[in-house]
Amino acid sequence: MDFIPNLAVETWLLLAVSLVLLYLYGTHSHGLFKKLGIPGPTPLPFLGTVLYYRQGFWKFDMECYKKYGKMWGIYDGRQPVLAITDPNIIKTVLVKECYSVFTNRRPFGPVGFMKSAISIAQDDEWKRIRSLLSPTFTSGKLKEMVPIIAQYGEVLVRNLRREAEKGKPINMKDIFGAYSMDVITGTSFGVNIDSLNNPQDPFVESTKKLLRFDFLDPFFLSITIFPFLTPILEALNISMFPRDSTSFLRKSIKRIKESRLKDTHKHRVDFLQLMIDSQNSKETESDKALSDLELVAQSIIFIFAGYETTSSTLSFIMYELATHPDVQQKLQEEIDAVLPNKAPATYDTVLQMEYLDMVVNETLRLFPLAMRLERVCKKDVEINGVFIPKGVVVMIPSYALHYDPKYWTEPEKFLPERFSKNNKDNIDPYIYTPFGTGPRNCIGMRFALMNMKLALIRVLQNFSFKPCKETQIPLKLRLGGLLQTEKPIVLKVEPRDGTVSGA
């Protein structure tokens, strides 16, 4: 048996002990849920249950919900994750015990200076940053931002008109991706870009590079399986966020800030300016104000959080309207009644449109971009008879809850009437969570909704959308880490008349 190396007994023993220790390292947490009497799929050494994610988070969560009931345990590598669906426990996790036990989201690898971004920051650091940013998202500030967003709505209409004139079906993600990029770079950095027609613009290139992110990426998976790599990578200055992109944006924001501090007479209302004002406000204690690096981190996280959610949701809405022409017509009638002769929308007129709100809410139910909500348990706790040990990640499977027939009649169907005034009060706020809920919900929720509604109003004033032979019906979701379609959403776009107002 020449292929077996001739090693000393001690060496073989050392090798055997090393393998046993390695196996124990890769499996030592995997008995937790069995010990607690919580069901779930069988984990593999080191990997846990992450291989199931290849079928998509949404599909895996739906299958677990059907198979195991209202609670189950999974393992992301060695990390125990407890899925809960009881609205009372969800309320305790997201609201009642948010500040004391479930303050933080799960850390997801080396992030460098981005650790101070509001979505990533922890404990007192998060509370300080949230309190500094909250005034930026008041209704008064949003009102002032409407004209900024509206100007990109005009660019969107021009681009749609140009594409429609070619007589070819239009890829919704391309069009709304450009709109989303323009609004976010405009409101976060104060730069004016028509990104669809200027794809080489350095801001566009840097932000797009920043957005190439997938939870099933080998780099991300390796950190999930071997969490001890995170501090090593942090020490080596390696980050999940591409360094060339963050470096470009850091320099750009520094330059823009210096320019604005010199030109104090010009009145601006965008996120960057509001954060600069917060830094210099007499009401903000100097030791609590945002540092320049923290300001950059917030601007970058606004891109990260806002681009995909806005562009994808708008694409899903247009698909639903195209495949439900009665809903599209009813929505256009509401828009025309509130804003005759293609009048521009204002903050107050948007709030008057009940049916628009219903359409957006129902689309967010069918396609919640945040498929899961997560909080880390900071100490051993018992909630409604369920013991949750310290260090466990508590996960709310939003997508699965949005399709639970116990809460939604015919959950697969697009029915905006679910969110009518008469029905809205019957919806449990801990079952319908497209933006999360509680103190750590999405801080930009109202901005995101206003942004999407302004785009929809301007587009539907000027165009109607129809399916074409390239449109995938029914829509199929891609298997993978993010909520994306298997094929691009492609629709036929028809001008409602021969002219486009204001474009």
From Swiss-Prot:
Presence of keyword Metal-binding: yes
Membrane topology classification: Peripheral membrane protein
Cellular component terms per the entry's GO annotation: endoplasmic reticulum membrane
Top EC class, one word: oxidoreductase
Catalytic activity: an organic molecule + reduced [NADPH--hemoprotein reductase] + O2 = an alcohol + oxidized [NADPH--hemoprotein reductase] + H2O + H(+)
Keywords: Endoplasmic reticulum, Heme, Iron, Membrane, Metal-binding, Microsome, Monooxygenase, Oxidoreductase
Residues bound to heme: C442
Cofactor: heme
GO molecular function: estrogen 16-alpha-hydroxylase activity; heme binding; iron ion binding; monooxygenase activity; testosterone 6-beta-hydroxylase activity
Domain of life: Eukaryota
One Pfam family from the record: p450
EC number: 1.14.14.1
InterPro entries: Cyt_P450 (IPR001128), Cyt_P450_CS (IPR017972), Cyt_P450_E_CYP3A (IPR008072), Cyt_P450_E_grp-II (IPR002402), Cyt_P450_sf (IPR036396), Cytochrome_P450_3A (IPR050705)
Segments traversing the membrane: none
Subcellular location: Endoplasmic reticulum membrane; Microsome membrane
Up-regulation conditions: P450 can be induced to high levels in liver and other tissues by various foreign compounds, including drugs, pesticides, and carcinogens.
A biological-process GO annotation: oxidative demethylation
Keyword Repressor on entry: no
Summary of the function given for this chain in its UniProt record: Cytochromes P450 are a group of heme-thiolate monooxygenases. In liver microsomes, this enzyme is involved in an NADPH-dependent electron transport pathway. It oxidizes a variety of structurally unrelated compounds, including steroids, fatty acids, and xenobiotics.
Entry's family note: Belongs to the cytochrome P450 family.
Protein name in the entry: Cytochrome P450 3A21
